[in-house]
């Protein structure tokens, strides 16, 4: 797709304003244009696209880097040691734009343009050592870590290093590194001449919903400032993607968000299938949609129950876990697993639906609407719940976009942005469903939107049940992994492909591709770079929760600690999704 066809006004305006500094358009298979810019206009171009152009790009969806030192297939791209990529979204245009910058290890900061670029730039510094010309702290790795893990020169396995020995000296150094001085962070310790209480909220606290620490400055029960500290759950998922085959990385996707099941597999496979040119059969697409909506309900039931629990209602979570069990029994019967199914495949799904699947699904669909009605009476209509949530933790659409908020957190402000409707994938254009919206953007609306989304997911699942097409569940394509078993038993070429893919790995054509979906928490995006091998050269995992937590310091000042707990619950995150 050419840039002129995708966003002609933006292209013309950008070239008119910056001329030759807009260096080149990169030929890719992406659904959006990819432009290279000069460093001299990197910040100015982002400011122009966000603040000055008609129909602007208010959302910085992602900012990430690529170590180009070992890459062989870069025809037509400027020389670069580390390439910096920003991914911008225009809601008015319903269009994306990716900007690239060739660097020698130094890059201008755009944190003054897009507020949420701060954490992304800290991550790029942490993982690649990029210097943004400002003080940049590590964010995922501990401050004592040596090296930058996503550089190609950094080891990927513990066996590549000498055995680890925890000496007394090292233990003391690591212990000192856990101490955070508010003064060094520029955070006040006095208010009106009185000393603030500095409190570590987490990392081991039930209300942080994971291994997550927030450093708080308190005046009595009032939160004066908050400083989130993440990284405790970091496992190096993007580094692992470089050491696994394209097929072998699928189980790792489940663990990016361990409550999302197959939802985290889908954007990765959409990206790989785009690179391979694979068209997924209609039956496989509908199975994917049905399972994604099941896992959306499973996640939202957990959120619903724990949200009520965190404001003092203990009963709902027990009832909702019982209903989640009914859903997990169906998912277990179809995929063979409850939470980590690894069921999707390159080109389709692992196997066809089992006998009796339709009766199980129909029983769930008949059961759940009345249960959701009961939960609405227990939670959303409760005067106590409304008193704790209405008007608390509110933000508007502009603020949400400024900090990269997507999903229910964005739609709670009244912004109608759902990729299943606006950019249908995997056959979502076939389904009739509504996009629930809020008005105030407060805790109550965020809860209400997710409660209503479960009803819409039930509608989608029922349409899958009633309209499931016949046909294969894997594409008839040489790069489908693994190939359909029936073809392997008849066709020697398919058997050879299976042998090569299983023993060596799928050889994916060189190029770049992105898979985007409307995940249960928001925009989930995988950007993959292939160098024509059996493994990914670079896999970028954009999760919604990483952006959502960055917003906490702007929302919670002035709240009580009890309201802080409610606000954290309303974000709906898991730390594996944040830290990867």
From Swiss-Prot:
Which compartment or compartments is the protein found in?
Cell inner membrane
| Membrane topology classification | Peripheral membrane protein
Please name the Gene3D superfamilies in this protein's record.
Answer: Cytochrome-c3 Hydrogenase, chain B, NADH:ubiquinone oxidoreductase, 30kDa subunit
Q: What is its EC number?
A: 7.1.1.-
The UniProt annotation puts the region (NADH dehydrogenase I subunit C) at 1-171
Cite the entry's keywords alphabetically: Cell inner membrane, Cell membrane, Membrane, Multifunctional enzyme, NAD, Quinone, Translocase, Transport, Ubiquinone
Q: What does this protein do?
A: NDH-1 shuttles electrons from NADH, via FMN and iron-sulfur (Fe-S) centers, to quinones in the respiratory chain. The immediate electron acceptor for the enzyme in this species is believed to be ubiquinone. Couples the redox reaction to proton translocation (for every two electrons transferred, four hydrogen ions are translocated across the cytoplasmic membrane), and thus conserves the redox energy in a proton gradient.
Q: Name one GO molecular function term.
A: NADH dehydrogenase (ubiquinone) activity
Segments carrying the region annotation (NADH dehydrogenase I subunit D) are 195-580
- One Pfam match, by short name? Complex1_30kDa
Q: Which family does it belong to?
A: In the N-terminal section; belongs to the complex I 30 kDa subunit family. In the C-terminal section; belongs to the complex I 49 kDa subunit family.
A cellular component annotation (GO) from this entry = plasma membrane
Q: What's the protein name?
A: NADH-quinone oxidoreductase subunit C/D
Assembly and oligomerization: NDH-1 is composed of 13 different subunits. Subunits NuoB, CD, E, F, and G constitute the peripheral sector of the complex.
């Amino acid at each position: 797709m050419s840039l002129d066809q995708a966003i002609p006004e933006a292209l013309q305006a950008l070239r008119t304003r910056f001329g030759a500094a807009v260096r080149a358009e990169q030929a890719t298979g992406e659904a959006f244009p990819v432009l290279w810019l000069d460093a001299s206009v990197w910040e100015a171009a982002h400011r122009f696209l966000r603040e000055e152009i008609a129909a602007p790009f208010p959302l910085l969806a992602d900012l990430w880097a690529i170590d180009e030192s070992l890459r062989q297939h870069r025809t037509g791209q400027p020389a670069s040691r580390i390439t910096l990529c920003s991914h911008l979204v225009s809601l008015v245009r319903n269009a994306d734009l990716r900007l690239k910058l060739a660097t020698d290890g130094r890059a201008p900061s755009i944190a003054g343009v897009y507020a949420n670029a701060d954490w992304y730039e800290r991550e790029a510094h942490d993982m690649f050592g990029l210097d943004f010309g400002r003080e940049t702290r590590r964010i995922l790795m501990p401050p004592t870590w040596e090296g930058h893990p996503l550089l190609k020169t950094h080891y990927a396995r513990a066996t590549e290093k000498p055995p680890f020995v925890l000496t007394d000296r090292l233990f003391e150094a690591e212990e000192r590194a856990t101490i955070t001085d508010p003064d060094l962070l520029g955070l006040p310790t006095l208010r009106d001449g009185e000393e603030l209480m500095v409190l570590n909220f987490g990392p081991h606290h039930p209300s942080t919903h994971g291994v997550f620490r927030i450093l708080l400055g308190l005046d009595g029960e009032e939160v004066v400032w908050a400083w989130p500290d993440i990284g405790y759950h970091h496992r190096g998922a993007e580094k692992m993607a470089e050491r696994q085959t394209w097929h072998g990385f699928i189980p790792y996707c489940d663990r990016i968000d361990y409550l999302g099941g197959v939802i985290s597999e889908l954007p990765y496979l959409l990206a790989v299938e785009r690179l391979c040119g694979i068209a997924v059969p209609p039956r496989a697409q509908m199975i994917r949609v049905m399972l994604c909506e099941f896992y959306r309900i499973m996640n939202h039931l957990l959120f619903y129950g724990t949200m009520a629990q965190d404001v003092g209602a203990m009963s709902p979570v027990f009832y909702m876990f019982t209903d989640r069990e009914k859903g997990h029994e169906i998912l277990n019967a179809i995929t063979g697993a409850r939470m980590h199914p690894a069921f999707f495949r390159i080109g389709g799904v692992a196997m066809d639906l089992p006998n009796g699947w339709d009766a199980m699904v129909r029983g769930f669909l008949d059961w759940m609407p009345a249960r959701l009605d009961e939960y609405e009476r227990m939670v959303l209509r409760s005067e106590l719940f409304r008193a704790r949530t209405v008007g608390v933790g509110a933000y508007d659409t502009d603020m949400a976009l400024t900090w990269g908020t997507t999903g229910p957190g964005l739609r709670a402000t009244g912004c109608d942005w759902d990729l299943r409707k606006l950019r249908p994938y995997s056959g979502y254009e076939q389904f009739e469903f509504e996009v629930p919206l809020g008005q105030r953007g407060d805790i109550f609306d965020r809860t209400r939107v997710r409660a209503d989304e479960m009803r819409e997911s039930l509608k989608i699942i029922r349409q899958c049940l009633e309209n499931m097409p016949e046909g294969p569940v894997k594409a008839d394509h040489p790069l489908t992994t693994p190939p359909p078993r029936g073809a392997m038993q008849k066709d020697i070429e398919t058997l050879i492909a299976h042998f090569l893919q299983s023993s060596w790995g799928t050889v994916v054509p060189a190029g770049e591709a992105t898979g985007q979906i409307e995940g249960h928490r928001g925009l989930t995006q995988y950007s993959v770079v292939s160098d024509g091998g059996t493994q990914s050269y670079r896999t970028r995992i954009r999760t919604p929760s990483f952006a959502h937590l960055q917003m906490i310091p702007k929302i919670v000042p002035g709240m009580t600690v009890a309201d802080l707990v409610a606000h954290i619950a309303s974000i709906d995150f898991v730390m594996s999704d944040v830290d990867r």
